[in-house]
Amino acid sequence: KWTIQIKTAAAISPLRLSLELQNINCRIMDIKREGNNKWSYSIDTSNSYVYKAEDLTGNSQLNLKKPTKPYIIRVSNISKINISSNVGNNWYPNIVFYDKDFNTIEVVEKDSLHKNLKISVPNNTNYIKIDDFYSLGNIKQGLNITKE
């Protein structure tokens, strides 16, 4: 169970919230009024996914542009990936593997500069977060990810 508290000047439109949640395969199951200014929503997230995650499930390679935040990659049934940095990048890999419920499976941190990295993907991985240990500026030219 999650609790999210939002303070707004106006009430949130249940229809608009429902439409936004549909974008990530979530559904509002129930709405309860708990006071003049308090509502409780029951939301089914069993088929949800991370919004705007890069998709490596249907592709063999991703060419990722300059990041504004760590990359989130959606994967399934892969055993290895090769991450290569574009010209001008040297980075300190910080990679986190997550299961379908976003529980951490494994964390890989490298305290040395890399241009290329071949890494095994743990079983049951559904998402991978790829970051630089120190600064996203180290991967400002982007990364290429290939599944093997």
Label the model's feature ranges.
Residues 75, 84-88:
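Non-cytosolic beta-sheet module surface loops
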